């Protein structure tokens, strides 16, 4: 099972909105097994991954709410299905803003209670693209439950915490102007 809705195809879809250049510095936040890091490296990008519990040598131990990267040092921040689990999307967005260079990109697909785009704009990002991908997330969620996979316990906790709120899955492309 993929570690985020849409798997590699979704990662490549996010990357369609950025003109990638060899040598760009990219940071995958909540990188897990490093799938996205490896995709970026295969495209000539200097990619790094950060995760609280890395499951690959391509990913370093770290907290994307407190990144150990200098300000204005990254060209591209990408995160898929991770910010929401931190329960502090606002701080995660602020850390992306801090480490991104001017003109840098934020590529995000995550659970959303309806304010993700607004939070990104309040942080300073210009929103270039936004897509509702709730159907993709529902398919992923059902597969996770069916397979009793790694994320079903996390989702059960989130279900309790966000009971009664309308959740959707949003893809967002932003730029630090």
List each model region and its residues.
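Class I SAM-dependent methyltransferase SAM/SAH-binding core
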Residues: 27-66
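A short glycine-rich, Lys/Arg-flanked "PGG" loop and its adjoining helix->strand segment in the class I
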Residues: 90-105
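A short SAM/SAH-binding and catalytic strip from SAM-dependent methyltransferases
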Residues: 76-88
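Conserved Class I S-adenosyl-L-methionine
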Residues: 131-177
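Short alpha-helix
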Residues: 113-124
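A short acidic, Gly/Pro-enriched loop at the edge of an enzyme's catalytic core
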Residues: 65-77
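Conserved alpha-helix/loop element of class I SAM-dependent methyltransferases that forms part
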Residues: 4-22
């Amino acid at each position: 099972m993929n570690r985020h809705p849409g798997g590699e195809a979704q990662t490549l879809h996010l990357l369609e909105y950025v003109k990638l250049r060899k040598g760009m510095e990219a940071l995958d936040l909540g990188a897990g097994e490093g799938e996205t890091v490896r995709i970026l490296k295969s495209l000539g990008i200097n990619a790094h991954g950060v995760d609280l519990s890395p499951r690959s040598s391509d990913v370093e131990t770290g907290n994307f709410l407190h990144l150990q990267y200098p300000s204005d040092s990254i060209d591209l921040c990408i995160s898929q299905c991770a910010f929401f689990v931190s329960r502090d999307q606002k701080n995660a967005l602020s850390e992306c803003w801090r480490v991104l260079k001017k003109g840098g990109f934020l590529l995000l697909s995550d659970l959303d209670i309806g304010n993700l785009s607004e939070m990104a704009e309040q942080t300073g990002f210009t929103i270039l693209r936004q897509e509702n991908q709730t159907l993709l997330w529902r398919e992923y969620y059902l597969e996770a439950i069916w397979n009793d996979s790694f994320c079903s316990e996390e989702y059960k906790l989130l279900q309790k915490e966000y009971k009664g709120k309308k959740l959707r899955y949003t893809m967002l492309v932003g730029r630090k102007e």
